[in-house]
């Protein structure tokens, strides 16, 4: 059984996303993935940025409630063009074709929300309080090129990004569809803003280097 020193609590990623797992593995290999029991629905009149932040916090707290000693990472990403209508994941080729046709020449705004939570201690109505909590939303602006149907079809043949809002993976071949990307954190668009997460882990006195060293020696 792997053990960590007392100053390094268990780290949990409240997500089953392979993209977020891959990003977190850049920082540490010592974490668990647990699926949060959260219904991901936009509330009436809720701004897309606010929805992303709410869901990130809900995911983290849903898992933290069951693992009170752990540091739990929650994240959510939403895309929009007007701030209020969320752009969903296409799910299949026909929807991805339509989404990329629609995105052609447009500027989309992606909001990647992050929550780091430990010790859900109380509930006040629907609000669950945590002993430690840090939250942030990192914005990314993506300008798409003018996309022909031929280019879209060739892209989807090579990289069927049906599980990505916007239907393109910036970390893969999808970069050829984009004219520009602007963000304070290049990892945010992939799904987990590592710059901000690193800062939050330091705030929580979680030492990435000692945690991995302890795991290697266990």
Where are these regions (language model features)?
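Anionic-ligand binding patches
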Residues: 2-11, 45-218
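Cofactor-binding loop segments of dinucleotide-utilizing enzymes, especially the Rossmann-like FAD-
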Residues: 16, 36, 119
């Amino acid at each position: 059984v792997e053990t960590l020193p007392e100053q390094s609590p268990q780290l949990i990623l409240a997500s089953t996303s392979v993209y977020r797992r891959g990003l977190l593995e850049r920082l540490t290999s010592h974490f668990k993935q647990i699926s949060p029991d959260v219904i991901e629905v936009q509330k009436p009149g809720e701004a897309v940025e606010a929805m992303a932040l709410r869901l990130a916090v809900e995911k983290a707290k849903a898992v933290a409630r069951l693992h009170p000693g752990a540091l739990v990472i929650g994240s959510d990403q939403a895309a929009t063009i007007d701030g209020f209508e969320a752009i969903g994941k296409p799910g299949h080729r026909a929807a991805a074709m339509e989404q990329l046709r629609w995105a052609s020449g447009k500027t989309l705004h992606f909001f990647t929300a992050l929550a780091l939570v430990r010790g859900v201690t109380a509930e006040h109505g629907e609000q669950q309080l945590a002993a430690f909590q840090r939250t942030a939303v990192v914005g990314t602006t993506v300008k798409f090129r003018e996309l022909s149907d031929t280019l879209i079809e060739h892209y989807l043949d090579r990289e069927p990004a049906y599980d990505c809002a916007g239907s393109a993976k910036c970390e893969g071949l999808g970069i050829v569809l984009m004219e520009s990307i602007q963000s304070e954190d290049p990892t945010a668009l992939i799904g987990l803003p590592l710059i901000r997460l690193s800062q939050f882990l330091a705030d929580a006195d979680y030492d990435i280097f000692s945690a991995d060293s302890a795991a290697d020696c266990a």
